Amino acid sequence: MNLDALQQRLGYRFSKPELLQQALTHRSHSAQHNERLEFLGDSVLNCAVADMLYGMFGKLDEGDLSRVRANLVKQQALYEIAQMLQLSDTLRLGEGELKSGGFRRPSILADALEAIVGAVFLDAGFDAARALIRKLYIPILEQVDPRTLGKDAKTLLQEYLQGHKIALPQYNVIATHGAAHSQQFEVECTVPKLEVRVFGTGASRRAAEQAAAKLALDEVQKLVPQLLKRSRAERTGKTRKQPQPQDPQLSLRLKE
């Protein structure tokens, strides 16, 4: 298997190419598979990402750092990076996995990426693995807000309203549809002060509330800047209309 193109995309060339080949080998293909490398890579990845976040975001507390890290190393994030690296083109899968589309499966691709991190660690040590992880993650971190990454819509809406001293939203289930085993909930979310009223649906009350909160947040983020602008304009207008106090010395001089 020619892995030159993948090594170029990784920005790292293995001194022991067999480690990379093993990292790309699923257990359905061979007994010499990537699961041990995946175990190792998972730990290296968590440590390197924690180190990177600690250095980049000095104002985030422990809870926020943990939240951001969890979102960066979860399966979906690893899957998206694996797609960017085109790992599906280089995976070694058994015949059954190939036929079932295993090369597209998020779990298999995410595991392979962790195994590659483990392989780099064995090939050249922690510094090399950390350099690879930084190369993969820095472009992602430049496009996200660490203060909001991983927070759900209800939390974001609540924090936004609290930040502008607006009363919290109200959620009410207004309808349920379908049979008991496949119900759909419809939830109303209102922000009375801003006259926002939206509706969300979902397979559970929580999912419906999240859907409604997302719509409400979109509306609130449009309205609040307009209200702030209007409020500033009104304050400026009142200031301009106030009469200037008369200088008493000037008044005396005029009388003379």
From Swiss-Prot:
<feature type="active site">
    <location>
        <position position="42"/>
    </location>
</feature>
<keyword id="KW-0694">RNA-binding</keyword>
<dbReference type="InterPro" id="IPR014720">
    <property type="entry name" value="dsRBD_dom"/>
</dbReference>
<comment type="similarity">
    <text>Belongs to the ribonuclease III family.</text>
</comment>
<feature type="region of interest" description="Disordered">
    <location>
        <begin position="229"/>
        <end position="256"/>
    </location>
</feature>
<comment type="function">
    <text>Digests double-stranded RNA. Involved in the processing of primary rRNA transcript to yield the immediate precursors to the large and small rRNAs (23S and 16S). Processes some mRNAs, and tRNAs when they are encoded in the rRNA operon. Processes pre-crRNA and tracrRNA of type II CRISPR loci if present in the organism.</text>
</comment>
<dbReference type="InterPro" id="IPR036389">
    <property type="entry name" value="RNase_III_sf"/>
</dbReference>
<keyword id="KW-0378">Hydrolase</keyword>
<dbReference type="GO" id="GO:0008033">
    <property type="term" value="P:tRNA processing"/>
</dbReference>
<feature type="binding site">
    <location>
        <position position="114"/>
    </location>
    <ligand>
        <name>Mg(2+)</name>
    </ligand>
</feature>
<dbReference type="GO" id="GO:0006397">
    <property type="term" value="P:mRNA processing"/>
</dbReference>
<keyword id="KW-0460">Magnesium</keyword>
<dbReference type="GO" id="GO:0046872">
    <property type="term" value="F:metal ion binding"/>
</dbReference>
<keyword id="KW-0698">rRNA processing</keyword>
<keyword id="KW-0540">Nuclease</keyword>
<keyword id="KW-0255">Endonuclease</keyword>
<dbReference type="GO" id="GO:0004525">
    <property type="term" value="F:ribonuclease III activity"/>
</dbReference>
<dbReference type="GO" id="GO:0019843">
    <property type="term" value="F:rRNA binding"/>
</dbReference>
<dbReference type="InterPro" id="IPR011907">
    <property type="entry name" value="RNase_III"/>
</dbReference>
<dbReference type="GO" id="GO:0006364">
    <property type="term" value="P:rRNA processing"/>
</dbReference>
<keyword id="KW-0479">Metal-binding</keyword>
<dbReference type="GO" id="GO:0003725">
    <property type="term" value="F:double-stranded RNA binding"/>
</dbReference>
<feature type="binding site">
    <location>
        <position position="38"/>
    </location>
    <ligand>
        <name>Mg(2+)</name>
    </ligand>
</feature>
<keyword id="KW-0507">mRNA processing</keyword>
<dbReference type="Pfam" id="PF00035">
    <property type="entry name" value="dsrm"/>
</dbReference>
<dbReference type="InterPro" id="IPR000999">
    <property type="entry name" value="RNase_III_dom"/>
</dbReference>
<protein>
    <recommendedName>
        <fullName>Ribonuclease 3</fullName>
        <ecNumber>3.1.26.3</ecNumber>
    </recommendedName>
</protein>
<feature type="active site">
    <location>
        <position position="114"/>
    </location>
</feature>
<dbReference type="GO" id="GO:0005737">
    <property type="term" value="C:cytoplasm"/>
</dbReference>
<keyword id="KW-0699">rRNA-binding</keyword>
<feature type="binding site">
    <location>
        <position position="111"/>
    </location>
    <ligand>
        <name>Mg(2+)</name>
    </ligand>
</feature>
<dbReference type="Pfam" id="PF14622">
    <property type="entry name" value="Ribonucleas_3_3"/>
</dbReference>
<comment type="subunit">
    <text>Homodimer.</text>
</comment>
<dbReference type="GO" id="GO:0010468">
    <property type="term" value="P:regulation of gene expression"/>
</dbReference>
<keyword id="KW-0963">Cytoplasm</keyword>
<keyword id="KW-0819">tRNA processing</keyword>
<feature type="domain" description="DRBM">
    <location>
        <begin position="152"/>
        <end position="222"/>
    </location>
</feature>
<feature type="domain" description="RNase III">
    <location>
        <begin position="3"/>
        <end position="125"/>
    </location>
</feature>
